[in-house]
Amino acid sequence: MLSTKVTEGSTTVSVPVPPEGVPFPPSEAPVFYNPHMELNRDISVAATSACAKRILLKKDMELKDITYLDAMSASGIRGLRIANEVGITSILNDWSDDAYGLILENIGLTGVSDIAEATCKNANVLMHERRFNIVDLDPFGSPTPYLDAATRSAVHFLEVTATDTAPLCGAHFNSGMRKYAAVPLNNEFHSEMGVRILLGKIARELAKHDKGMTPLLSHATRHYVRTYLQVKKGAKLADKAFKDLGFLSHCEHCGHREIFHGMAISISDHCSSCGNDVYIAGPLWLGQLHEPQYCDEVLLELEDRSLGTKEQAKKLILACRDELDIPFFYDQHVICKMIGVSAPAMDMFIAALRETGANVSRTHFTGISFKTDAKIDTIKDVLRSL
């Protein structure tokens, strides 16, 4: 296997040279490596360091005693960066013999053999066998085949990436139903829909093991969804998390939407505002996507590090921190098209909407999205006035 060396953060590893003529990081390579996920990994380093410090505040243990599982490690770059740049013990697992060999090579290359362990196992088997303070799932595709084992294995924190955004966001409807046991909607806020369906699925998996969760940071970026969750042991905490599960009713005719908390509920097929048929999505997570204090902790970690995507990462985390804690965002252009007006500048529109007494924020999802507690009729009136 031909390889080349790459450096991310302060960590240098060997990664496979992709097949000739293949422009995008290919699944055909003997060991998968995606340079476009450097932002994801940079944030992971900062976020995992923030998680580790939270563990140390509550547990009488040393940094190196905290265990982190990179369940599908491939080249090992994510887990090795955690070991090298965070200083906690990383278990780097991959079922591929080629990947396992490369991980062993990279452990030697980075000089972290005292706090890095390579394993070559089925990820589900490993997670059923052992418990880890932090479990990181970053599979090629959907994380759903691994969530039962991961939610059992994670003691304090669970970090999950989903790259199957088409099923999550409703573009591949039946696939999304099968994988996530939820009805998605493929509309203007489909990216947030994907985040909340993923979180809803994780909450239900955790509940099977009498665990609850608190989302600390969740974002939809490029072709993937990523979330960082605090895991909370106890049946009562699992029950509490279930109170943040529910459904969305959305009218595409007038833009009215309603959320309904609970799993066994009755929802009208008709819009309570205009009477037209509505689309219903769920079950999905209706609680917070981000914890502002945790976002600040991640920002401090980013500031203290030399990272290739530092400014981009900081911008993303700031946007997440400052989002209103409301499901779901609105798309300004969709509403303008609905009422037949030109879209004004976002800053001017947000200022005008705030003058009505409404709370408003931009979001990290798109440049033309916003969240508000204003009613749809108020939003339309403001847009017509500009």
From Swiss-Prot:
PROSITE patterns with a match to the protein in the record: SAM_MT_TRM1
GO terms for MF: tRNA (guanine(26)-N2)-dimethyltransferase activity; tRNA binding
Enzyme Commission identifier(s): 2.1.1.216
Binding site for Zn(2+): 251, 254, 271, 274
Catalysed transformations (reactions): guanosine(26) in tRNA + 2 S-adenosyl-L-methionine = N(2)-dimethylguanosine(26) in tRNA + 2 S-adenosyl-L-homocysteine + 2 H(+)
Main enzyme class: transferase
Protein keywords: Metal-binding, Methyltransferase, RNA-binding, S-adenosyl-L-methionine, Transferase, tRNA processing, tRNA-binding, Zinc
Residues binding S-adenosyl-L-methionine: 41, 78, 94, 123
Pfam family, one: TRM
Residues annotated as domain Trm1 methyltransferase: 4-383
InterPro entries: SAM-dependent_MTases_sf, Trm1, TRM1_arc_bac, tRNA_met_Trm1_C
Domain of life according to the entry: Archaea
GO BP terms: tRNA N2-guanine methylation
HAMAP family, sorted: tRNA_dimethyltr_TRM1
Reported function: Dimethylates a single guanine residue at position 26 of a number of tRNAs using S-adenosyl-L-methionine as donor of the methyl groups.
Family affiliation: Belongs to the class I-like SAM-binding methyltransferase superfamily. Trm1 family.
Protein name: tRNA (guanine(26)-N(2))-dimethyltransferase
Gene name as annotated: trm1
